């Protein structure tokens, strides 16, 4: 694929089971995703939707779901016309046990060179995943920043 890709790897001192739960439980997601709510059954073929203040921000389909190991989703940005015009991207979460920790690898890609959307998520994912790591290890998020609709 000659497209655009963002990869982020972090190690979180938690079990793969608890990390999986954090990736797929709406109440937990809302804590580290700056108040955004997510709806999905997290089963292959099911849809997922993410909302900020009641407005649809992103949506897609669950393409793979292997508990505690791998979650693959199609991803369509719904709120910025220039991002939506790029079409569906693909977001992959891979979890590997590493001793007392879990290794989380996130890969967000699109089959489009120089994607503006991948450029934007490459700034957003580090904040989200830093919050996830902090929440799971300390019980509190690292950042309280909330993206507005114009960001």
Show where each model-derived region lies.
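Terminal, regulation- and interaction-focused segments at domain boundaries
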Residues: 2-16
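Short beta-edge strand/loop motif at the mouth of beta-sheet-based domains
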Residues: 7-8, 24-59, 146-151
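Hydrophobic/aromatic beta-strand elements that line small-molecule binding cavities or substrate pockets
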Residues: 10, 59-64, 89-96
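A short, structured loop/turn motif at beta-sheet edges
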Residues: 16-17, 63-70, 94-103
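Hydrophobic pocket/interface hotspot
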Residues: 19-20, 29, 48, 62, ...
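Short, charged/polar surface micro-motifs in flexible loops or helix N-caps
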Residues: 54-56, 64-71, 77-79
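Beta-strand/loop substructures that line and gate deep hydrophobic ligand-binding cavities in soluble
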Residues: 80-127, 132
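Short, highly charged C-terminal tails/helix-capping segments
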Residues: 134-151
